[in-house]
Amino acid sequence: MLYLTKISNAGSEFTENEQKIADFLQANVSELQSVSSRQMAKQLGISQSSIVKFAQKLGAQGFTELRMALIGEYSASREKTNATALHLHSSITSDDSLEVIARKLNREKELALEQTCALFDYARLQKIIEVISKAPFIQITGLGGSALVGRDLSFKLMKIGYRVACEADTHVQATVSQALKKGDVQIAISYSGSKKEIVLCAEAARKQGATVIAITSLADSPLRRLAHFTLDTVSGETEWRSSSMSTRTAQNSVTDLLFVGLVQLNDVESLKMIQRSSELTQRLK
């Protein structure tokens, strides 16, 4: 029996940790080539030995054998699917019913949230919130879907009194970056961490003495190396994607947590401003 089939059919037989491993492997099967048992263990908050035992439970000698088998199965499955159906997004194909599509999308987003939340270092997150709270000026950078996440965060921060710039034009982003000062904060949102526009802005911000906070993936990247602080996000999306759906879900979970943390830090005044904002917008109706 194929390992992917074994994993799908044995759900009720898995322990809590084994189910975490199974969910991760199914969601990230297209990216297993670059995943080690150590990385998995850190990301899932379990021991490496648990991963090895999981592989052996399925009949493999160890994680390496299981990983290579899964990669082979995924490649063969993709070739077969390519001949009969069009990939629409991630694992969703033109043969799927709307019910199946809904289940796949929901599971993809659930996994992105679960795996991102599992990575949070709350002491570091608290430090980041304190740094942002003291910033005279905040710049948020991002491209495409990440820019939408950034714009949403900028609206939330402005509502509670922060001075924020979040421009869609990359030339304006670069111009703002070079004008930052010591004490200012740049929040750079990029899942890949390698977009040249975002990296250029981060370089400029660091040069000016600003603090760079990156919301990015676990992968080593130019942005990750430039940042003073990183907030990690996980997305199970593959190269077969029509839009960064679960990536945005993961990023939004981080930015929403930052916002609520900042509200909590100055709760009385923040709630007053939120109330005033609500009253003003009600008058526009």
Swiss-Prot record:
Q: Whose protein is this, by species?
A: Escherichia coli O139:H28 (strain E24377A / ETEC)
Q: In which pathway does it act?
A: Amino-sugar metabolism; N-acetylmuramate degradation [regulation]
Function of this protein?
Represses the expression of the murPQ operon involved in the uptake and degradation of N-acetylmuramic acid (MurNAc). Binds to two adjacent inverted repeats within the operator region. MurNAc 6-phosphate, the substrate of MurQ, is the specific inducer that weakens binding of MurR to the operator.
Q: Where is the SIS domain?
A: 128-268
Gene name linked to the record = murR
Residue ranges flagged as DNA-binding region: 37-56
- Write out the entry's keywords from A to Z: Carbohydrate metabolism, DNA-binding, Repressor, Transcription, Transcription regulation
| Protein's UniProt name | HTH-type transcriptional regulator MurR
The UniProt entry, under HAMAP family, shows: HTH_type_MurR
Q: Which GO terms describe its biological process?
A: carbohydrate derivative metabolic process; N-acetylmuramic acid catabolic process; negative regulation of DNA-templated transcription; regulation of carbohydrate catabolic process
Q: Does the keyword ATP-binding apply?
A: no
InterPro entries reported for this sequence: Homeodomain-like_sf (IPR009057), HTH_RpiR (IPR000281), RpiR-like (IPR047640), RpiR-like_SIS (IPR035472), SIS_dom (IPR001347), SIS_dom_sf (IPR046348), Tscrpt_reg_HTH_MurR (IPR022821), WH-like_DNA-bd_sf (IPR036388)
